[in-house]
Structures are given as structure tokens and as C-alpha cells.
């Protein structure tokens, strides 16, 4: 277990964590806390959706998180909304 009670990441999870570092602060606002607090304990399907999400270009991801467009994959769209809802509820507390 790591300091924040997350399990030690596998090599594949480390690769995904590294890929989650983006060049846009708007995306980092969502991705950094998600990686630190939820990613390692998420179900395998959610981790796979997150990995798939990271294959999208930053402008597309920004559009998803600002509701300008949505990904075709319903599981990815559900994850975008989960991360947004979770992150904004953290900001209010």
C-alpha cells in the first residue's frame, strides 16, 4: 500500500498514470486527483475505459469534460461524468 492507502501500481498502471499527465491544466484538474485517489482501486473495466480515454487528443478530452462533445463509447462517457461529478463535489467540500 502507498501512503494514500492505494495499492502499489503494476507496470501497466504506472504507464497509464504517466500517460495521464497532460499539457492542459484543465485536464490535470480532473486527472491528477482521480489518479491519486480512485484509479488504482477502480474496477478493471473502469481502468480500461480510462486507458482508452487517454488515447484521445487533448482538445477532444477537453470537449468531453466541458460538454462540448461526447465520446462514442458509452462507458467512457459514463467515466467522464463520474470523474467530473466526483471532482466537483471534492471542490465544494
Curated annotation (Swiss-Prot):
Keywords, A to Z?
Chaperone, Cytoplasm
- A single GO BP annotation from the record? succinate metabolic process
One Pfam entry for this protein is Sdh5
Subcellular location per UniProt equals: Cytoplasm
Coiled-coil-forming residues are none
Q: Record's InterPro entries? A: SDH, SDH_sf, SdhE_FAD_assembly_factor
Q: Any keyword Chaperone?
A: yes
Q: Name one GO cellular component term.
A: cytoplasm
- Key word Chaperone present in the record? yes
Give the protein's biological function: An FAD assembly protein, which accelerates covalent attachment of the cofactor into other proteins. Plays an essential role in the assembly of succinate dehydrogenase (SDH, respiratory complex II), an enzyme complex that is a component of both the tricarboxylic acid cycle and the electron transport chain, and which couples the oxidation of succinate to fumarate with the reduction of ubiquinone (coenzyme Q) to ubiquinol. Required for flavinylation (covalent attachment of FAD) of the flavoprotein subunit SdhA of SDH and other flavinylated proteins as well.
Put simply, this protein is called FAD assembly factor SdhE
The record lists the organism as Psychrobacter arcticus (strain DSM 17307 / VKM B-2377 / 273-4)
Give the taxonomic lineage as stored in the record: Bacteria, Pseudomonadati, Pseudomonadota, Gammaproteobacteria, Moraxellales
Q: Which gene name belongs to this protein?
A: sdhE
